[in-house]
């Protein structure tokens, strides 16, 4: 939109670097190494915001936000037709870490049926289809420009609609099962049950 700036405030901060309580940070300054970013407690947004340009809505996930499937789905629930992930993967070095982040992006594409354009300053950049297929990519510290036709999708998957509800239900069932087992063992030990 001409003349209108759209903002997204990162909603999921990197624990230990972007999200460290000040009392911990002050006490442990001697352990902190400079990774080229901000260290300490920085502000964060509440949820993903979909940007709109020429009638197309994009979900602009920043770095670690792509690790949280339900949070990531917030972009889609707010209308994102495709996702754009920007990331600073440089602090991983040439380790499997940056490759793992790219793989997680593939999982998010499948969960929400959204194509992804991922741009990492030193890590792996590329295009991922809504099925998780990888298109053109640039590898570790590889400079270049890649382009692709990015299909748009407005339909919501079950996971996008309901998020982690199945996982939460499973957690409650497990908790109730453990409590039942403990109560049963207690009653049995005290000869209250035959």
Explain the meaning of each model-derived region.
Residues 191-194:
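Cytoplasmic C-terminal tails of single-pass
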Residues 1-166:
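Soluble catalytic domains of enzymes that build or remodel membrane lipids, polysaccharides, and related
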Residues 138, 144, 182, 187-188:
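Short leucine-rich amphipathic alpha-helices used at interfaces
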């Amino acid at each position: 939109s001409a003349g209108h700036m759209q903002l997204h405030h990162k909603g999921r901060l990197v624990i230990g670097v972007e999200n460290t309580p000040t009392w911990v940070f002050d006490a442990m300054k001697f352990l902190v190494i400079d990774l080229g970013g901000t260290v300490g407690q920085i502000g964060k947004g509440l949820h993903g915001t979909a940007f709109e340009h020429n009638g197309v809505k994009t979900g602009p996930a920043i770095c670690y936000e792509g690790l949280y499937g339900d949070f990531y789905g917030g972009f889609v629930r707010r209308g994102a037709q495709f996702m754009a992930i920007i990331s600073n993967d440089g602090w991983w070095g040439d380790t499997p870490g940056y490759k793992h982040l790219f793989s997680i992006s593939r999982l998010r594409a499948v969960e929400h049926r959204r194509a992804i354009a991922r741009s990492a300053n030193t890590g792996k950049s590329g295009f991922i289809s809504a099925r998780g297929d990888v298109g053109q990519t640039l590898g570790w510290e590889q400079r270049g420009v890649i382009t692709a036709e990015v299909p748009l999708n407005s339909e919501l998957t079950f996971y996008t609609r309901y998020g982690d509800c199945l996982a939460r239900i499973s957690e409650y069932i497990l908790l109730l099962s453990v409590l039942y087992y403990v109560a049963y063992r207690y009653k049995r030990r005290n000869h209250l049950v035959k």
